[in-house]
Amino acid sequence: MASSLTCTGVIWALLSFLCAATSCVGFFMPYWLWGSQLGKPVSFGTFRRCSYPVHDESRQMMVMVEECGRYASFQGIPSAEWRICTIVTGLGCGLLLLVALTALMGCCVSDLISRTVGRVAGGIQFLGGLLIGAGCALYPLGWDSEEVRQTCGYTSGQFDLGKCEIGWAYYCTGAGATAAMLLCTWLACFSGKKQKHYPY
């Protein structure tokens, strides 16, 4: 099967897919922030949450429903910062995934990725990583929302975790973006074969 990638390009394609998958999984999982409420573990993502309080009419008290799900609407996300984070991080993950899938197709299709296309793809990866990094930087601005303060204690605020801790999905998302920005962008410059020019 013909490939439009150099040996470095094949490594770039595989690493691009790994970085994109890592960032996308981290983005989708609701484990960016860990805490507890009413004695039950609670976790948050940018647009999803695990365990939430509901009022039990029969017992006339608040109880925790231990299941994960996304917020009922985009406006239901606890803070404007998290809504922006969701859009920015989602867009960045989409760009990384687009480049990764194109790079993997370049392993099987000849003349798909030239040196110029590889460099443009690297630039798109850098932009995607930058967007995800911006989303990760925005996320702590939402820690002063009422939902987070109920879970992390009323000492929590912007960039102050209170009783909570950062979860593995936050690190996973950031690590995928960092690797895409630093490694994949550099490898992309050497990924495409030099185009052959045929005289017609």
Curated annotation (Swiss-Prot):
Tissue/organ expression: Pancreas, kidney, skeletal muscle, liver, lung brain, heart, colon, small intestine, uterus, testis, prostate, thymus, spleen and placenta.
Pfam families cross-referenced by the UniProt entry: L_HMGIC_fpl
Record membrane topology: Multi-pass membrane protein
Entry keywords, A to Z: Chromosomal rearrangement, Membrane, Signal, Transmembrane, Transmembrane helix
InterPro entries referenced in this protein's UniProt entry, alphabetically: LHFPL
Domain of life where this protein originates: Eukaryota
Known disease link: A chromosomal aberration involving LHFP is associated with a subclass of benign mesenchymal tumors known as lipomas. Translocation t(12;13)(q13-q15;q12) with HMGA2 is shown in lipomas.
Protein name per UniProt: LHFPL tetraspan subfamily member 6 protein
Gene that produces this protein: LHFPL6
